[in-house]
Amino acid sequence: ASDVYKRQVQEVGASTVKMSELKAGDSFRDFVGPLGCASEFVEEDIEELKKQKILFVAGGLGTAPVYPQVKWLHERGIDADVIIGAKTKDLVIMEKEMEEVAGNLYVTTDDGSYGRSGMVTQVIKDLVEKEGKHYDKCVAIGPMIMMKFVCLLTKELNLPTIVSMNPVMVDGTGMCGA
């Protein structure tokens, strides 16, 4: 419903701690968003998208913006594979929601506490080189360093890749002076 707002917040300071304590029905004094552009998939022909094999790579909180894109594709009969990477098991988010909409879901943790052990790039390598999977497009959203190494690998694999510039946006409004 258009009157529903869902949030994923990582508590890192006073404001995000306060946000995480909000309950259904509580309100913000002010709220701006969503900012930015919709996924480029909404501009593409659905029948053409159905012919493509798409891989999403979500690192940490990057799982939150990956989910609605995968869900949107799923609702149109397009299965996408998803890799969720996190530092530890406790930091894996939205796994159940993603299982419902992903063609295949792979979870990896840096410390090996859950899912596969290691980085998302190793999972990509395994899927392509060991399991023989082919992808037409990759979308990576997460920490800058993760997206950098995903891009270095997907360049080697000749796999077109889209990344999110959200990590370099300070407030999205220009009020910060950036």
Predicted regions and their residues:
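Short cysteine clusters
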Residues: 171, 176
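Short, structured beta-strand/loop micro-motifs enriched in basic residues and often containing a Trp
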Residues: 6-14
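Short, small-residue-biased leader/transition segments that mark boundaries at the very start
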Residues: 1-5
